[in-house]
Amino acid sequence: MKKTTQGGHTSHPILSALVAIIVVALIVCAYIVLGPGPTNFAGGRRVELSAYQAQDPTGVPAELKSASLVERGEYLTRAADCLVCHTAEGGAPFAGGRGFVLPFGTLYSTNITPDVESGIGGYTDANFLDAVHKGIGRHNTKLYPAMPYASYTYMSDADALAIKAYLFTLKPVHAPAPANSLVFPFNQRSLMSIWSLLFNPDRRYEPNVERSAEWNRGAYLAEAMEHCGECHTPRNLFFALNNRQKFSGSVQGGWRAYNITPDRSSGVGAWSDADLIHYLSIGHADGRGTASGPMGEAVDESLSHLKPSDISAMVVYLRSVARVATADLPEPKTNPAPSSPADGMAANADSHGKAVYEGACAGCHGWTGVSPVIAFATLTGTRAVNDPTANNVAQVIIRGAQRHTANGADDMPAFGDAYSDAEIASVANYVTARFGVTGSQLTVAHVAQLRAQD
């Protein structure tokens, strides 16, 4: 029904409401699309690399500057963490085929060995740069952002081509990637052109002249190479990184990538530099935790191969990012649990979780949470057991964990086949109640979902 105003004009309430909704939607979209870049938090003046007067933050560290192109490319391939994503379980290195379960389907990584038919053997330098920087494969194929080209876009041309030079020395493996299984509209690759237009700046790293050379090196490694934000930064409605919440944590592949901002309670603000250096270098820091899942892979195949100067530079950079609190993560409990299993918190009335823990876990992890066997197995003070979701605790129980050290490998066996979803939920809830700030309420259904990430 139309209403007539005093001026004789007719108003349309429905139309007015629709216009208001559209305006609000446009404002929200603009807010999302016009988000800050990964290093904007630092302020200061950025310049093109060619105009930067201090030490070049790109390339390899000083001790490798005289190495051959292929040797430099091998180091940078490690720094870019290519192997993990492009190797299927039991498959040939770099031959692709690893599946990534996403909310809208499953994507498979591609073959990046120099096989001409199924790999990158036919790629020119220009083709390779397009893939790394723009998400455009050979024959103009649009790549999905599971390939982190929105981070790799900051990689210098020289570094990208050094990686290509190394990859082309590998043995060609004929291994076509399995077909992706994505629901509509995500199965329409053409939409990636729009996504890239909105969220991929296609811009190389620009050093910040008001920050130190070490900071710039750390920024380049964390953003352009190691692409830390791809796991540790939440995503917006369009699956792009939300840098307003930079490094505040996210869930990737069923694993929780925790807050790595300087927040003291929920991030790494209470960690010493030595803690961070040890964790990044070997995947463990006493009293802080042991890397597992995707972070464990990143340490094993990438971070542990970096020179100490590069690890230190990354720590300098991590210390500088904006502090963001994660609401559901309390400051970890650092005091051990009682030495007697009869004392302390019990997760559930029937003590089923306690029984499972006693039979399978206590021998290595102890009743106090401080391992009587090896420091890597200590639970006290770790983020995972203080996470009220118990997500990563359950994942480690299901899949196990392995840390590679100078003295060999330290393993925690996988119990996914040995215990039911109900048993895993019970023992995970017991662990968080006994050793963490508060007990979790992990459900059988959640454990089943975690299993499905295979």
Describe every region a protein language model picked out.
Residues 71-74, 80-87, 102-110, 114-154, ...:
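The feature marks the first
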Residues 82-85, 228-231, 361-364:
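Short cysteine clusters
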Residues 119, 368-371, 404:
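Alpha/beta-hydrolase active-site loop signature
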Residues 280, 380-423:
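Extended, polar beta-sheet/loop recognition surfaces of beta-rich domains
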Residues 349-390, 395:
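C-terminal structural cap/anchor segments
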